[in-house]
Amino acid sequence: MDSTNVTTDPNLRPRRGGLQRRFAIIEPALQPDTVTDKIGKDGRVVSLKSNYANFNIKVEGPFYMYDVVMENKSIRTKLELLLAYANSKNNGQPFCFDGRRLFTTSKWHSDEDTENLVIKDVEISIRLLTTFLKNSEEYYQMINIVFNNIQIFMGQEKIGRQFFLGSNCESGGIREGPSFFKMDNFKILGGYSTTITRGTNENGTASTLLYLERINRVLNENNVVSVYRRDQIDQLIGRDIITKYNNKTYRISDIKEMDVNDEVQLGDKKISYLNYFKQRYNINLKNDKQPFVISRVKRSMVRPKEKTENEPEGPTETDQSLSIPGELCYLCGFSDSERSNINLQKNLGTVLKREPRERLNDIRDFCKWTGAGKSKDYMKSWGMCIEEQPITIRGRELAPVDIFSNEVKINTKIPDDWKFGEIKFDVPKGTAHRFGVLVVDRNPSHFNNFIEDVKREIGRLRINYTMDSISSCRSNEVEDALTDFIRVSKVHMALVFIPDDKVYAKVKNFTMSTGLLTQCVTQRNGSNRDDRRRKTVADKSVMQMFSKLGYDPWGINLKMAPTMIVGLDTFHSKTGKRSVQASVFSISAKFSQYISFVNSSKGKNEFHENLGKNFLTALTTFQNKFNTMPLRLIIYRDGVGDSQLAFTKKFETDAVMKMIEKIYENQTLPQIIYVVVKKRISVKFFKDGANPNPGTVVDEKIVKPNFYEFYLVSQKTTKGTASPTNYNVLMDTKFTNKKTNEVSVMSPSVLQQITYSLTHLYFNWMGTIRVPVPTHYAHRLAELVGKIHRGVTPPAINDRIRERLFYL
């Protein structure tokens, strides 16, 4: 199957500036060749609403796209100038503009492709790039820009990639529109995210939908100068800042103390920062010497052919460093301490966490706010009409999954929550476990109550244990103290009371290197005087401790032919250093225990090479345990953005297939199902004005016609609005039944039920999670290693714990 579905008009001849052949469907075709049925059948049918709307534009085309050059002005000013020209010369013919590209419904040029205009004494040069028709790639770009222009006419400003109320606005200047909230040093700017997307009609053809969501941007009124401390630079690196003079956002890569009189190369001349900001933005810098924010902005480039002979072509990136005076850089979002401030988050949560009924009104409110003033006239010129009600979708609620602990069902009250059930570990009789206790920088007596809570819970579970080795040490002696546990006490696991994240990193690094399992508890939780809260933490710690030792607190009945389930994820450092890839492979019939690997690769070739080695080791382990190779591999891949889907489909799935063919040489190949998991989506579903129930699946209407995808809500949400997870199947080879020799693909219903069942097996939470557990374990492992080693090549996982969930 081609990577893209193409529809062309045979009457159109390609020429510069003329009508050209264009793709009618711009997304790549990711649906596997073997799949014909993409809609599941199991479950109870329910009616849902979603944050999409139908809309109509009467303008038919043809359309013209120009490149526009004018003196440096804000996009709002440029748009106003072009509007004045359209009203005076073209009788108000519709157009849209994104700051550089101009789209029109009539010719703005004469016989030459380039036209020079003068509008209100401003010289403007426009150059024709192409003309196009409806349902082309440019058409959808144009409609997205139309909606961006509508928001500009509503009085919003572009911050980053979205449109919000202006960063300099105050409560008294807010016109009717998105919400504005201010408290202490924080501003919350409201806005809308609008995108034209493709859906699927009942007959399988493509439809066009308007995705719409209310969004917020959190701004901190503190600039970098006011919060800068030399010994706390690490707390600022990785955070986002906004520069209010141009409403652009940047990420802090580094901070350096500089002088505003230092010079920077600007074209063919040098200019001081002081003079640059005075001449360009009329800003007088106040502090001569101050911290400068260093932001490394990545620019995409095309790799030279000579560098891509042995790997697929794709974009690479080069770094361009920007230095910005700290007094002009205002922080966005929250610091770690602000994020953990319960009172602050509670107050701001009234704006940030919106309930389902509020979100259902977003489309109606958007229509109301755009139906006045300049935005109304602008929409009228395009003949645009938006349905004020969100679309209705058919969903299905999958059957609840039974949870068993020691062969007893424990989710009898609430299917997706079994915290009231009694957990029992199936520990063989006579097995004894030795635990050591280490207290860092504190007196061990402060944690006696917590230790007794732990002992009481282990005793309740009727597990043999000893916990006699209790030690204390300073922060710089942690490794030595843990080494004594291995050499002298010979413990199976250490319970460590940690004062901060730095000690936590030391402990987990020691675990990976030596294989000593550890359970970390913050000293705040360990010394809590509230008996109930302290006991809750102790009980949860015990559950994690024995899960790390290889015992299952609960399980599910998921009967399949010998199957291995794989989780893949990548951690990207905020500082732009090397990424960390984690892969986990199931090695138990209940899909509860995994063998884990972590790698730091320089490029895609090295990534595939490491992944091949991991697959070989995992499959060999599986064969040794079950005396057979897996007949089916289900791979859940996280960490793939929308722009990487086509690349992943074309190259990564092909690389996986070649690995498996090599490993299974002279054997029947297993069925391979490769699924991309995407959590960071803004699609919402609503049932009767509230959140949908866990187990709700949507695989119609809003899914793309050239994708094999579905949405699954697996968690119950009591505050705010539930977020589904998107699953995109890139590969689904055929399964061969050895008994009957029948060949078939996995039905959508079965894959959806397996995916939902796997969200019940995270042994750190007695309930469902948003993604299948191997995906989450890979995420936990990649994040743990990435944060500990900060871009440095991580050590290999010690063989003693490779088959343990040490990262719980």
UniProtKB/Swiss-Prot annotation:
Expressed in dividing adult somatic stem cells (neoblasts). Residues 492-790 form the Piwi domain. InterPro entries: PAZ_dom (IPR003100), PAZ_dom_sf (IPR036085), Piwi (IPR003165), RNaseH-like_sf (IPR012337), RNaseH_sf (IPR036397). Residues 214-333 form the PAZ domain. It comes from the Eukaryota. Keywords: RNA-mediated gene silencing. The keyword Zinc-finger does not apply. Residues 300-322 are annotated as: Disordered. Pfam families: PAZ, Piwi. One of its GO terms (biological process) is regulatory ncRNA-mediated gene silencing. The keyword Glycoprotein does not apply. GO terms for molecular function: RNA binding. Belongs to the argonaute family. Piwi subfamily. This is Piwi-like protein 1. The lineage of its organism: Eukaryota, Metazoa, Spiralia, Lophotrochozoa, Platyhelminthes. The gene is wi-1.
